[in-house]
Amino acid sequence: MRSYLKSIFILLLAGGLAAAQTTPAEQAPAKPAAKLGTHATADLPSEATVDSFLHQQFGYQADLTWKISGIRPSPVEGLAEVTVVLASPQGQQLTKFYVAPDGKHALVGEIIPFGAKPFDPAKNLLEKGITGPERGPKNAPVTIVEFGDLQCPACKAAQPTIEALVAAEPNARFVFQNFPLEMHNWAAKGAAYADCVGRASNDAFWKFVSKTYETQSDITAETADEKLTAIAEGAGVKGAEIAACALEPETKAHVDASIALGKSVDVTGTPTLYINGRKVGSFDPRMTDVYKGLVEFAAKQAK
């Protein structure tokens, strides 16, 4: 679904298609945020301008709506970064485009790190900021960090491949960081429960995550507390204590810090993996051999 909507977004913007009537999704205020390499000197377009631009691009497609999630300076000096949530019958996708300093051109694509060691900035940020449950040797030459959302179908689909990758790689340490997406109505609650389970028992955490993904389609916003409490109990911790912990301000602070860490390294969707700082943003279970190659290459580079 992520790749489908992203492809539609790129094709429509790149093709310059325009104009018919639709009703955009209700807009959220722009949320400027600092991150590594951000240039605060960029001239930011207004939400009204961005909305008009999107209306001209997508207005003819009645089943496609959008919500402006953020407008802020990009990592590249002079470029403004616009984050938009696109919604269609296929689902929702968080995506970005960039506005040139002249305010008359937009760039569609991904800004990637460049340099002799392009992945070191993200690697260093993650090494300092990761707090999630982990598996594998502490001194492993490779650290794989997953930013995940327990309500995310793509995360559920990716888990068997990620599990196999971690199990087969003695060179890898694996860390899970909560990154609940606003578009999912019980994801934040799931992250709070997961945070509490992880602090209570590292072993129970992995059982909790596995069972939550397994029963994901049975959980709703209305039943989340009941279901997640039972899953926590089944994972080997006291469900009632976890439910109480999930409501504590400290827990929300932990989850918010994990989200902030993800945003600092440019996480925009889930699952997103980092292999020693190298971003793998579109996880495809069919590419297991490629991911193994990335881990092995990172291990050699770390020597």
What residue ranges belong to the model's regions?
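Bacterial N-terminal signal peptides
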Residues: 4-16
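Short, structurally constrained coil/turn elements
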Residues: 14, 60-62, 138, 168
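C-terminal cap of thioredoxin/glutaredoxin-like
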Residues: 21-47, 51-108, 229-303
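Residue-level preference for short coil/turn positions at secondary-structure junctions
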Residues: 78, 138-140, 189, 269
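A short, surface-exposed interaction/processing loop segment used at functional sites
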Residues: 101-133
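A short beta-strand-turn-helix
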Residues: 125-142, 166
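Structural alpha/beta surface segment adjacent to cysteine/selenocysteine redox centers
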Residues: 145-233, 263-268, 293-303
